[in-house]
A protein has these predicted regions:
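Extended intrinsically disordered or low-complexity regions, especially N/C-terminal cytosolic tails and loops
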Residues: 1-102, 133-137, 144, 161-235
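Amphipathic, heptad-repeat alpha-helices with coiled-coil/zipper character that mediate oligomerization
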Residues: 68-73, 106, 110, 151-158
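A short mid-domain helix/strand-loop element embedded in enzyme catalytic domains
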Residues: 76-91, 109-125
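Short, hydrophobic, well-ordered secondary-structure elements
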Residues: 100-120, 139, 143, 147-150
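Long, hydrophobic, amphipathic alpha-helical segments used as structural scaffolds
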Residues: 115-127, 150-157, 199-206
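Short, mixed-charge amphipathic alpha-helical segments
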Residues: 124-164
Length: 235
């Protein structure tokens, strides 16, 4: 059995809810950034390719290249971190494109790793049980997706698809995992619902006014007799 902890169970759950919310914010900001890049460079490509003489333009258009750098482009000898054809750049930044997929995969791996290595052991200590007694179907699915992303080049094999309890219908067998906006939103909601289920179980709520699977978001409010622990002062 885990060593007893001075942490309250609901405090640890709240920390994970806050962490999920941070990832939701990062995901939405990233999508906005990709969309902005796509719109801005689409206009620039059209301006670069438009005809500037009376002769008909090439049917395929002039080849254009995107030069990207974190440094000031007006300065000489800057280092370009990316040189890519404009069509490939636009394809990567389109809705559902490679950049969105890469970001979605990173977030899901981050969500599972923080749960498995940090939150789950602390929940177990707060409850006085072993970590493997803290179980959640959505976390099992995230573990499977993490392993597919890291070890199978994101290709979903039949045996792994069969092991998905909640997210199986989101993906096709023997194809690369593809995360849509709607799919990511569903995963975020399922994570919040799981946090609610953990709280209901800890509080002993069996017949509440709502069920965890009916919730879309979760917030924990501490009463006047129960204040959150303040952060330690910086040295």
């Amino acid at each position: 059995m885990s060593e007893p902890s001075k942490e309250q169970f609901d405090e640890v759950v709240r920390e994970y809810i806050d962490f999920v919310n941070e990832q939701v914010g990062a995901y939405m900001s990233a999508l906005a950034g990709f969309a902005g890049h796509h719109a801005r460079f689409s206009r620039q490509v059209h301006r670069a390719n438009r005809p500037v003489s009376t002769r008909p333009p090439d049917e395929t258009g002039m080849p254009t290249v995107v030069w990207a750098s974190y440094e000031d482009p007006s300065k000489p000898d800057i280092i370009h971190n990316q040189i890519i054809r404009s069509d490939e750049y636009l394809e990567a930044n389109r809705p559902g494109g490679a950049n969105e997929q890469q970001h979605s995969r990173s977030i899901l791996i981050f969500l599972f790793t923080y749960w498995e290595d940090e939150i789950r052991p602390r929940l177990a200590r707060a409850k006085g049980v072993e970590p493997n007694e803290i179980q959640a179907d959505i976390m099992g699915d995230l573990r499977t997706l993490r392993n597919i992303i890291l070890h199978s080049k994101s290709v979903l094999r039949p045996d792994k698809h069969a092991s998905l309890r909640l997210l199986g219908e989101m993906f096709e067998v023997n194809k690369e995992l593809e995360f849509t906006y709607e799919g990511m939103h569903r995963i975020f909601v399922l994570l919040k619902q799981e946090c609610a289920r953990l709280l209901f179980g800890w509080l002993g709520v069996e017949d509440g006014p709502v069920k965890p699977e009916e919730l879309k978001d979760v917030a924990i409010q501490f009463g006047p007799g129960r204040l959150r622990k303040s952060e330690p002062d910086a040295p």
